[in-house]
Amino acid sequence: MPVQVKICGINRPDALAAAVAGGARYVGLVFYERSPRHVAPELAAELARQVPTGVRVVGLFVDPDALMLERVLGSVPLDLIQLHGEETPERVAAVRAAHGIEVMKAVKVAGAADLDRAAAYEGACDRLLFDAKAPKGVAALPGGNGLSFDWTLLAGRTWARPWMLSGGLNAGNLAEAVRATGATAVDVSSGVEDRPGHKDPALVAGFLACAAAL
């Protein structure tokens, strides 16, 4: 089964074009102002309109309130909401019920206990995403930090929802990450950038080529 790829943090047409041309299944737009990948709703709407049928548009939010979700969803055609903050299972379920759009919940992983806690979200969301938890005392964004976690923690685990692997992925470690975890879907952001927030179309193409070869 081919590995599906999400290119997250798209904020320019050339990065979007590279993602689509390379076979990305998902493209992510970040609605978190502290991120260097943040896009305003107006630009996000313009980019989303360029996405062809068959590629799903994901909106990444960090602890959004109802007003923010309504403002973005009112202008940007999203296929999936990604919640990447400290949202509780109850909040995730409420967002899912309110908007009628698939919801993917990011779970930050440092150890096995974090994966155990992920089970609480299985009834609240449509998909899970496993990302690396930043070490204590390290100033980091909620995602896109280029950090990975111990992939063997996922080996042999089964989930009631489809899931995606994220955290520190790049063309050089993708094959090992998929082998170690059994992931059938992966999410990359900083691993296809030449500087924070700037996707390199050549790196995007290279990552997608590696995924296609698995």
From Swiss-Prot:
Record-level Gene Ontology MF annotations: phosphoribosylanthranilate isomerase activity
Keywords: Amino-acid biosynthesis, Aromatic amino acid biosynthesis, Isomerase, Tryptophan biosynthesis
Pathway(s) where this gene product acts: Amino-acid biosynthesis; L-tryptophan biosynthesis; L-tryptophan from chorismate: step 3/5
Keyword presence, GTP-binding: no
Top-level taxon of origin: Bacteria
Enzyme class of the recorded protein, top EC level: isomerase
One record GO biological process: L-tryptophan biosynthetic process
Enzyme Commission no: 5.3.1.24
Record family assignment: Belongs to the TrpF family.
HAMAP family: PRAI
UniProt protein name: N-(5'-phosphoribosyl)anthranilate isomerase
Gene behind the chain: trpF
